[in-house]
From Swiss-Prot:
Phosphoenolpyruvate binds at residues 22-23. The gene is murA. It comes from the Bacteria. Its main location: cytoplasm. The modification 2-(S-cysteinyl)pyruvic acid O-phosphothioketal is found at residue 117. Signal peptide: none annotated. It is found in: Cytoplasm. Belongs to the EPSP synthase family. MurA subfamily. This is UDP-N-acetylglucosamine 1-carboxyvinyltransferase. It catalyses: phosphoenolpyruvate + UDP-N-acetyl-alpha-D-glucosamine = UDP-N-acetyl-3-O-(1-carboxyvinyl)-alpha-D-glucosamine + phosphate. One of its GO terms (cellular component) is cytoplasm. Pathway: Cell wall biogenesis; peptidoglycan biosynthesis. Its EC number is 2.5.1.7. The active site is at 117 (proton donor).
Length: 424
């Protein structure tokens, strides 16, 4: 098993490029299942564990896949299965994205209940509700979601999501693009990753309007085609790298970004006293002499992202004053808190929010990753901690960050990957 060994205390400086977004790549890859027509070519696909798992799933279904130098080529002309098995789906909750495309194309699919990060409830109710609204009969039996179309194809419908859900919005989009008639998605997710999926589906021939708003209107089409497409860059990775600059007192430029996708995060950095400048696709952050405490509440886009909440908690351990952190999306997403406290942080849980007392001097020790963003949080803490921090179980980190230790090392961090034996 792999761990990251970090010797903290180095101010980071320099320029680093953002990778392609995992959270947009996965639904885009799933959408290639919608048509047997041609071979897709998709650029800027990050080489991550979750992407590799999704490729395995496509290959299991019968797709021909080539992945090299961040370019993915997919042909779904000869699929042999409509079932996504537990052995693959258990590794990653985003596997649920195959539900809509397989149902739309074949009229029947069986998808194992998903896995992924182990924090809080992960209901699939909104995905099921969307498929049922479009005319499918859905049952859950023996750990599988079994969905069947009543008739020759799905039928357009009005779907009003009770809460904003990126996953359910994506699945509903992919199911609706070839449905008969018009589908209206109300309270659709606003995240840039959904806009990216919409642009991809449009390029394939889908008829979608209202992109970038909470109301998406889809007029079903009879046929879609394979296309070339460029994935968007990863706003969460960019935010994490900027956080590494802020926590170490450094100055870092992240290129290849879409700065407006990070508006709420950049605002929070500025409130903390950081100097943040934007020029074209580049964001430069210079840390202040003293970080100021900033309260954040994680909510759906365009508010502060839940996927940056853990990293922000690490940063606030160094702020001169107390701060509060609330997560309105995943109320229990605080698995990183005990490990931060092991490093010397002073963080308390009050009901469903965290109180971070700062500043606290952190001292390196062994800490264990529990999920993807918790791993990133512990890496940031290790960068500022005295002595040596060992972040164990970094397979979580590899699910969402492409060679992050290489990027941090290039910015001046003393960080390396090592193998270790974990005792059962």
């Amino acid at each position: 098993m792999n761990k990251l060994v970090i010797r903290g205390g180095k101010k980071l400086s320099g320029t680093v490029a953002a990778s392609g977004s995992k959270n947009s790549a996965l639904p885009v890859i799933a959408a290639t299942l919608l048509t047997p027509d041609g071979t897709f070519g998709i650029n800027r696909i990050p080489d991550l564990k979750d992407v590799r798992t999704f490729i395995q799933l496509l290959e299991y279904l019968g797709a021909a896949v080539s992945f090299e130098n961040n370019r993915l080529e997919v042909s779904s002309s000869d699929l042999k299965s409509i079932e996504a098995p537990y052995e693959l789906v258990k590794k990653m909750r985003a596997s649920i994205y195959v539900l809509g495309p397989l149902l739309a194309r074949f009229g029947h699919t069986r998808v194992s209940l998903p896995g992924g990060c182990a924090f809080g409830p992960r209901p699939v109710d909104l995905h099921i509700m969307a498929m049922e609204k479009l005319g499918a009969t859905v049952t859950i039996e023996q750990g599988f979601i079994d969905a069947k179309v009543n008739g020759s194809r799905l039928r357009g419908a009005e779907i009003d999501f009770p809460i904003s859900s990126v996953g359910a919005t994506g699945n509903a989009l992919m199911a609706a693009v070839t449905a008969e008639g018009k589908t209206v998605l109300q309270n659709a997710a606003l995240e840039p990753e959904i806009e990216c999926l919409c642009r991809f589906l449009q390029k394939m021939g889908a008829n979608i309007s209202g992109i970038g708003t909470t109301t998406l209107v889809i007029e079903g089409v009879d046929q879609l085609k394979a296309v070339e497409f460029d994935n968007i860059f990863d706003r969460i990775e960019a935010g994490t790298l900027l956080g590494a600059a802020a926590i170490t007192g450094g100055s870092v430029t992240v290129t290849g970004t879409v700065p407006e996708h990070l508006g709420s995060v950049l605002d929070a950095f500025r409130q903390a006293g950081c100097i943040v400048t934007v020029k074209d696709d580049a964001i430069t952050l210079t840390a202040p002499e003293e970080l100021q405490p900033v309260d954040i509440t994680a909510r759906p886009y365009p508010e502060f992202p839940t996927d940056m909440q853990a990293q922000w908690m690490a940063l606030m351990t160094q702020a001169h004053g107390d701060s509060t952190i609330i997560d309105r999306i995943y109320l229990e997403r605080f698995n990183h808190l005990p490990e931060l406290n092991r490093l010397g942080a002073h963080i308390e849980i009050r009901d469903n929010w965290a109180l971070v007392h700062g500043p606290q001097e952190l001292t390196g020790t062994k800490v264990m990753s529990t999920d993807l963003r918790a791993s990133a949080c512990l890496v940031l803490a290790g960068l500022v901690a005295k002595e040596t921090t060992e972040v164990l179980r970094v397979y979580h980190l590899d699910r969402g960050y492409e060679s992050i230790e290489k990027k941090l090392s290039a910015l001046g961090a003393d960080i390396k990957r090592e193998q270790y034996q974990e005792f059962s």
